[in-house]
Amino acid sequence: KFERYNMITIDEFKNKITKKSRLIGLDLGSKRIGVAICDEYQSIATPFKTLQKDNFNKFLDELKLIINENNIKGIIVGNPINMDGSLGPSAQSVKDVCVNILKNINIPLCLWDERLSTVGAFNLSSQLDIKVSKKIKNIDQNAAAFILQGAIDYLKN
């Protein structure tokens, strides 16, 4: 039964979506979940919103609504791989959440290496001269956009 809910590789993901598919990117934190969406041509990822993680059913309902309202065809989830390439407890937690998402939402889902995504999102907002308070407030959705952008850039090649 568990195999049905396995995540697929980015290359398998690429084969399951069309070139004109909007995708959603998720940065699963311990308290918040950053959400980003890309355009149908998979050119640019845009920060969308931050969801709270305290109630999984509420999160799932919000995720389903976002997916339906935005015609999303695939999910990219940041995979918190350690800097040395190993998988720690955070990676297992993300996989557990992904399995639960897949039990409830029937579109392709794959994990994408999220190393340094939060740092990258923070640095990008620094380059754009965004106030620190706003950077921190939006860091989760910006990290999700950073993750999603990396994945869609890979998918284009």
Predicted regions and their residues:
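Phosphate- and other anionic-substrate recognition elements at nucleic-acid/protein interfaces
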Residues: 6-24, 31-157
